[in-house]
């Protein structure tokens, strides 16, 4: 769902383990790593989209996690001009509703092949602030904003 300004509605997930380390996924067939994220479908709430993406990308169900917090506002980032597609509707970036979750069940429930088109082919737990400097450059600011927003909920 792309708004009139050219931003695609999206959800992003910060998944914590019991040690407050975060899930960090390597994108399939790429060298880049990121948090789980994905678009909000027409007629879908951000919460519904988050649970759908959580299952599609990480293989976890609602009973596997606790929702700790979500951002009140949508956080935006622009994509580089070289990645903007020329066909309609033009998407210049993403506006994201962020969710902070805690894993309640065993990490053995994480399944990167829960659907037919996996997003990730590898994952690991990393320190809370690690992703800011290791995500693709054009997402660094939005990652910093989200992690700073959620910091008050971390032990």
Curated annotation (Swiss-Prot):
Entry keyword annotation includes Hydrolase: yes
Reported function: Accelerates the degradation of transcripts by removing pyrophosphate from the 5'-end of triphosphorylated RNA, leading to a more labile monophosphorylated state that can stimulate subsequent ribonuclease cleavage.
Protein name per the record: RNA pyrophosphohydrolase
Enzyme Commission numbers on file: 3.6.1.-
Family to which this protein belongs: Belongs to the Nudix hydrolase family. RppH subfamily.
Residue ranges annotated as motif Nudix box: 38-59
EC top class, as a word: hydrolase
Transmembrane annotation, as ranges: none
SS bonds (residue pairs): none
Cofactor(s) demanded: a divalent metal cation
GO cellular component term, pick one: cytoplasm
Biological process according to GO: mRNA catabolic process
Gene Ontology terms for molecular function: mRNA 5'-diphosphatase activity
HAMAP family: Nudix_RppH
Recorded name of the encoding gene: rppH
Domain Nudix hydrolase: 6-148
Organism of derivation: Francisella philomiragia subsp. philomiragia (strain ATCC 25017 / CCUG 19701 / FSC 153 / O#319-036)
Pfam families, sorted: NUDIX (PF00293)
Protein keywords: Hydrolase
């Amino acid at each position: 769902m792309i708004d009139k300004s050219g931003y695609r509605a999206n959800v992003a997930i910060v998944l914590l383990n019991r040690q407050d380390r975060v899930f960090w996924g390597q994108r399939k067939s790429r060298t880049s790593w990121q948090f789980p994220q994905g678009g909000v479908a027409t007629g879908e709430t951000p919460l519904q989209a988050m649970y759908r993406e959580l299952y599609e990308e990480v293989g976890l169900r609602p009973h596997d996690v606790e929702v700790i917090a979500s951002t009140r506002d949508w956080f935006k980032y622009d994509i580089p001009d070289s990645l903007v597609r020329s066909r309609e509707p033009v998407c210049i970036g993403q506006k994201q509703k962020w969710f902070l979750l805690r894993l309640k069940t065993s990490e053995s429930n994480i399944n990167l092949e829960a659907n037919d088109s996996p997003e990730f082919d590898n994952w690991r737990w990393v320190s809370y602030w690690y992703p800011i400097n290791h995500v693709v450059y054009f997402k660094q600011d939005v990652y910093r904003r989200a992690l700073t927003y959620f910091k008050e909920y971390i032990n």
